[in-house]
Amino acid sequence: MEHADQYSWIIPFVPLPIPILIGMGLLLFPTATKNLRRMWAFPNILLLSIVMIFSLDLSIQQINGSSIYQYVWSWTINNDFSFEFGYFIDSLTSIMSILITTVGIFVLIYSDNYMSHDEGYLRFFAYMSLFNTSMLGLVTSCNLIQIYIFWELVGMCSYLLIGFWFTRPAAANACQKAFVTNRIGDFGLLLGILGFYWITGSFEFQDLFEIFNNLIYNNEVHFLFVTLCASLLFAGAVAKSAQFPLHVWLPDAMEGPTPISALIHAATMVAAGIFLVARLLPLFIVIPYIMNLISLIGIITVLLGATLALAQNDIKRGLAYSTMSQLGYMMLALGMGSYRAALFHLITHAYSKALLFLASGSIIHSMEAIVGYSPEKSQNMVFMGGLRKHVPVTQIAFLVGTLSLCGIPPLACFWSKDEILSDSWLYSPIFAIIAWSTAGLTAFYMFRIYLLTFEGHLNVHFQKYSGKKSSSFYSIKLWGKEEQKIINRNFRLFPLLTLTMNNNEQPYTIGGKKEARITITNFGYKKAFSYPHESDNTMLFPMLILLLFTLFVGAIAIPFNQEGMHLDILSKLLTPSINLLHQNSNDFEDSYQFFKNATFSVSIACFGIFTAFLLYKPFYSSVQNLNLLNSFVKRGPKRILLDKMIYLIYDWSYNRGYIDMFYSISLTKGIRGLAELTHFFDRRVIDGITNGVGITSFFVGESVKYLGGSRISFYLLLYLVYVFIFLVISYFILF
């Protein structure tokens, strides 16, 4: 094993030649490089595949004999300070390396076709290679300073890719928003690193953990200061992993190309925050207040992400809030001390979410042929529906990813999420109730997305919409090259809750406001429309492989053993595993508890799915005059109250909980107001004092000149009087 580990330093640098060669090619041979741009995908995929094979070898050796290998080079040494640069190989490193490389390979294969017509094809692949290099460098870092360097590189690459289509104002604003939000967390991370160096005198993980534990055990450190430093470290993870209250950048990050959305949400940027907390868990675990803070932030994010996903029109934004909620589950597990469950869910969620994003990219790709190249239209579920018969392979992939995220066995996320839900009962009943309730919400909003996208009929054909520029509803805008005209931004999916087929029924009224209903009655419309088409094989192949991962990756950590069979590979890989909730366990009791909790969690998920079907499954042909909500609550005061509550919830969710608005008012406008006040104080007060002294001197001089009548004798007399007064004042002050 030692022989393989000695060459582990090469892992981050294998993909690095690609952006260097692309840059040199564009500088030296720009025409040839652009003409042969598709050739760069192959070496990119090949080099990342080499890293994947190397990571698999490391993981196998970790399973056979778990150990930690660290190698460092002295970078700067003097009498006061020494810094070492190296790599750190353990089970967490091997897991993250496999995750980054496998998801990265599938995303690169997918991107070759998805980005083939984009002018920024070469730039995209250069950024992607640098992104993978940065993330691999992060997970192999051996100290906090090295982590911070690669942490910033990961952030830089994500900003470049979020703002990839920088000519579009929305993409540029999203890039700025991600940058500013993450600056807050990164500044906290840097302060926390410096604080712990001041306490322990070391940046190296093993030395840091050992010294800090001894200081805590001997009560030789100020506990409040330690808690503050640990909170600052955690702030970096909060921003990077889009945890409340620094989550606002993640939905807007969907302005980047869909493949990068898959990579960010599955294996790179948002995973970096979870990795940081997992890496520093031996540090956090001796500070109970920090563990409570981590679990509290996690459970708030779980619930907030799920509720904000309920009424999103944009398919990618809905998936983004789903990612936020699932990251909250991972953070909750880490805060509870359930290290294994958190990493297990990180793995299963990565493959499931990568599958969902690549499938959504296939959907967007097919919709662009009808509505044009504009995210406001091609990603809008208002225009979708009935895609099941047009993109069947994509539909199957999206359905499998949806079922996995809902926690339906035997798919990947079922095993990991159920373990977190089970552990939550041991930690806090209140947290458990919230976590289990959110599992039902997850099933509801995920199937809402699925039903609005794939079931029913293609809504774009019944919206009086045309993809031509003459349309009064939208104008085609090619990535910011043209002015956007009329956009109906207030169109919401709340009316889809009440499907009515009765042409004579009046619009529905809430609180004096008329809410229009979508009524589709004439399916015999003869006008020929263009229809979506299935994506090419190079886009479908990665989706099918990820589908297999989603089906079978849960087998690496089946949480119970049969006689003679040891199926829990993940626990072997994570030996010794940190778990504060299962220090003493019995296999039979654990198996019984697992089946009991699994039955309950699947029942909650099925209830969420059933509710989504009731509200969003179209009944166009079979029940022409059925208003579904009327089957449960007849029209009257109770029905009006129910509708007001539903509208209130959907309005709150649609507007992102008004959190972005609050930040805009309190922070953005507040800072602008402070800047204007500072400018006023500087110009009117500070400059006023300076200018006032000059003006006063001028008028005093003119007054003296006028009184003296231009006689030198008077000036001398006045001068002597002033000197005498000055001497008198000085005498009384000194003596």
UniProtKB/Swiss-Prot annotation:
Which GO terms label this protein's molecular function in UniProt? Answer: NADH dehydrogenase (ubiquinone) activity; quinone binding
Its main subcellular localisation, reduced to a broad class, is plastid
Q: What is its EC number?
A: 7.1.1.-
Q: Which domain of life is it from?
A: Eukaryota
Q: Which Gene3D superfamilies does the entry link to? A: 1.20.5.2700
Keyword Thylakoid on entry: yes
Q: Cellular location of this protein?
A: Plastid, Chloroplast thylakoid membrane
Q: What name appears for this protein in its UniProt entry?
A: NAD(P)H-quinone oxidoreductase subunit 5, chloroplastic
